[in-house]
A protein has these predicted regions:
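Asp-based, Mg2+/Mn2+-dependent phosphohydrolase catalytic module
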Residues: 2-12, 20-22, 26, 34, ...
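Conserved phosphate/oxyanion-binding catalytic-loop motifs
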Residues: 45
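Switch/connector loops and helix/strand junctions flanking conserved nucleotide-binding motifs
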Residues: 50-51
Length: 327
């Protein structure tokens, strides 16, 4: 049975999974439109309102409304309610749409530490600079609760990995020596909220980043599917901590149409893997075997080792051929 038929909903990451910047990832749109499963796009990118994200999805031919989108900014507003009183002053570091969400949550939005905010919430926005970060830091030093929408250190774009919200949060954390509570992935709350919105009992979490998408799905006790179209690639998978390991691995979203057993870590494509001291050796391989088949073969053995392999050593010519592009 295909992986997709074993589940009743998709909880999809966006950046690096469905698109990069403004460009749809090859095959993603066709697969999502053809799979016939209800989906929610669960994104750590707090720079756009759900309505804007839905418009962007529609622009690449994916049918979506604001109800099909759950952002870390929305999750941050929900989290704020656990820390401050209704109507409290909140200093927002981030996009205008984030400020609107905070206002819609019943809070008073301020922009200066002099306003004595009860909380500082920080989300990604390309325009964030020294002034906003400093006002946030001053407020936190005065006792404001510090909430981050997400802690992704980088953001996939068409030109490569850009600075993410987590890197900007790190500047404030360094200045204040206060670590924020985080609302977004890898915390499980977003996935639980998304599944509840769809009435799903067997959701599949799909993403490209091990430390957010996969870790969050695992924390929510959901099945996870990792794609190689974004941030975390082969070496990251081989070195992944237990809580960051996906149940299934594919090259892209389209692989969800494959038999689930093909997507699990384990021997395939005629490859074999074995431990040699601190190293992992990959051998054999059928003539038409692929890189991802070698990866799944290697993962089963690598994940059984007490520590990540020191070196990945290809033995056969086929193994050398297919793993030369691993990164």
């Amino acid at each position: 049975m295909s992986l997709i038929k074993q589940h009743d909903a998709l909880l999809l990451d966006l950046d690096g999974t469905v698109w990069e910047g403004g460009r749809a990832i090859d095959g993603a749109v066709d697969f999502i439109n053809s799979c016939a499963l209800p989906s929610i796009y669960v994104t750590n990118n707090a720079s756009r309102a759900p309505e804007i994200v839905a418009e962007k999805l529609s622009a690449i031919a994916l049918k979506a409304t604001a109800d099909d989108v759950l952002t870390s900014a929305q999750a941050a507003v929900t989290l704020a309610g656990e820390h401050v009183s209704p109507g409290a002053k909140i200093l927002v570091i981030g996009a205008d749409s984030f400020r609107d969400l905070v206002r819609d949550g019943g809070y008073t939005v301020v922009s200066s530490a002099d306003d004595q905010p009860a909380a500082v919430v920080q989300g990604f926005d390309p325009s964030v600079g020294w002034e906003q970060l400093t006002e946030g830091a001053l407020a936190i030093r005065q006792g404001a609760v510090y909430i981050a929408s997400n802690l992704d250190t980088s953001l996939p774009t068409e030109r490569g990995l850009a600075v993410g919200n987590g890197s900007l949060v790190a500047a404030v954390q360094t200045a204040t020596e206060v670590a924020p509570v985080s609302a977004g992935k890898p915390e499980p709350a977003m996935f639980v909220q998304a599944a509840h919105r769809l009435g799903s009992t067997k959701p599949l979490v799909v993403g490209d980043r091990l430390d957010t998408d996969i870790a969050g799905g695992n924390a929510a006790a959901m099945t996870t599917f990792h794609v190689l179209t974004g941030v975390s690639h082969e070496i990251a998978l081989l070195e992944a901590d237990v809580e960051h390991r996906p149940n299934f691995i594919g090259e892209s979203l389209a692989d969800m149409a494959r038999n689930a057993n093909e997507l699990r870590p384990g021997p395939q494509g005629g490859f074999t893997a074995r431990v040699d001291g601190l190293d992992l050796l990959i051998d054999n391989g059928d003539a038409d075997a692929t890189s991802i088949q070698a990866l799944r073969t290697a993962l089963e053995v690598a994940w059984s080792m007490p520590k990540p392999p020191r070196y990945i050593q290809p033995v056969s010519d086929k193994a050398k051929e297919v793993i030369q592009g691993w990164r």
